[in-house]
């Protein structure tokens, strides 16, 4: 089964991650569901073959991996929005600085696996 990655918060860091994984030939653009509040900023990504969404719940529906790359002050709202749709098929990866795994578990109240990672935008050129 082909892996599908949802990137919630496809801004600088989220897009850098997606581009870096595609550049490395590990994934193809169509394996990414990119979500962002201002979806018009993802127009070029759609032209490159990425799936784009302005609905976070829709973005994670067919994903195995959910990467959360939002600003720290937005994480509670985003996790509240996603928690009913997250299940045991998902792996949640948080790129949000200053937010511990225990805090995420407290919000989502689920037993899904959670990983915390801290790449930087150099990941887009596989240097992070």
What role is predicted for each listed range?
Residues 56-61, 65-68, 72-128:
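Rossmann-like NAD(P)(H) cofactor-binding subdomain of soluble oxidoreductases
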Residues 1-54, 58-61:
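NAD(P)+-binding Rossmann beta1-loop-alpha1 motif at the extreme N-terminus of oxidoreductases
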